[in-house]
Amino acid sequence: LALRTGISSIIIPNVLDFENPPQINEKQTEAFWQSIGLQKNDVKIVQPTRIIQRKGIEHAVQLVEELDDPRYKLIITHEAGDEGFDYANWLKEDAKQRGVDLRVINIHMSDPMNPDVNQKETHSLWDVYPHADFITYPSLYEGFGNAFLEAVYFKKPLLINRYATFVQDIEPKGFDLIAMDGYLTRKTVSKVKAILETPEHRANMVNTNYDIAAQHYSYAVLRRWLNIMLANFFGINR
């Protein structure tokens, strides 16, 4: 904004309540996984997005194919919608040809941030994350990256594509992630496999990421920036 118009601005990032870890309803989350036919020994690779071409979900399909283990299941949390179904149909066919067990959740998810809005929906993303083993987020571009922040909040390892906003605003914070540059390499697949098979390494990774996010994307950060903005606009400090 400053470069194009000369107007200064303050960027308020997406935030989550990192001061308080997520409250997990074990009965609810177990019921969710059972409802889509998964077993306890299945390794759940979760793509927590809608099926849209810019999400680059074909890379997640390729990842599961190259991990080459029948225990690995790819779960996409939202169906296609207003953007059309051509990509979704192609993606499902591609997964079938590659021998990837792909599950697309076709129930409407309630908003975990507004639980009273959609009371008829019995599940939300907060039921998905707790038992996920790995998160894929190979988006081509994003405004910010809600799924990235949610994965960190639930202490899940993830694969992320280095889209422009990530490179500019998130990567400099020093998160410990498995990153790809527009395509999946054997080295990247090996890193994913190592994380999935090494609990100690995985725990160190996700705990480090949680601590970093708490410093930069917590409610405390939001409160601080709002106080600064109020002081700038009105000369007061709340």
Show where each model-derived region lies.
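A charged, aromatic-enriched C-terminal amphipathic alpha-helix characteristic of glycosyltransferases
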Residues: 197-231
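Carbohydrate-associated surface elements
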Residues: 15
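A short hydrophobic beta-strand element within the catalytic core of glycosyltransferases
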Residues: 135-136
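Aromatic "clamp/platform" in nucleotide-sugar-dependent glycosyltransferases that forms part
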Residues: 140
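A short helix/loop element that forms part of the nucleotide-sugar donor recognition site in Leloir-type
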Residues: 22-38, 90
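Nucleotide-activated donor-binding/catalytic signature segment of Leloir-type glycosyltransferases, i.e.
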Residues: 85-127
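Conserved donor-binding/catalytic core segment of Leloir-type glycosyltransferases
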Residues: 34, 39-55, 61-64, 74-75
